[in-house]
Amino acid sequence: MNPRQNLDKQMLRIITGYAVGIVAAFLLGSMLGTQVVLASVQSMGLEVSWAARVDATLDDLLGLSATLLPVMALVLAVVWGLYDVIMTRMRSARGPYHYALVGGLCILALHPLLGAVLDVDVFAATRSWFGLLTQATAGAFGGWCCGRVRI
């Protein structure tokens, strides 16, 4: 394999890893976020059926793909890219758990920062610590998926 083919293969793996990680983080984050919001509706004494949960989850996946997905994609791609550059320059080993840590911390910081800058809760599920931690978990899962594909 010549150096050009090797570089092309490496770039494809990087792009695929980032894409898989972003989609995984978004899907899990959207689904968990919907369930957090529905749990708070249920805590007010309203009944939420499984059919309503499935409907709301599907609606949110579609609706949030225009708002949450682009924000997560931009932030995660930039942070994972910076992580890759730093680790390459330091000649340090990378692992799926490192990408998970970076992704989780990134999303954990993202929502409060957006709230502070825009003076509004961008994603209702992150109004509570539990909701924010579910989103960080989604970012960590996306990072783990990214790392598994990348390495």
Which positions does each model-derived feature cover?
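Juxtamembrane/disordered regions of integral membrane proteins
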Residues: 2-151
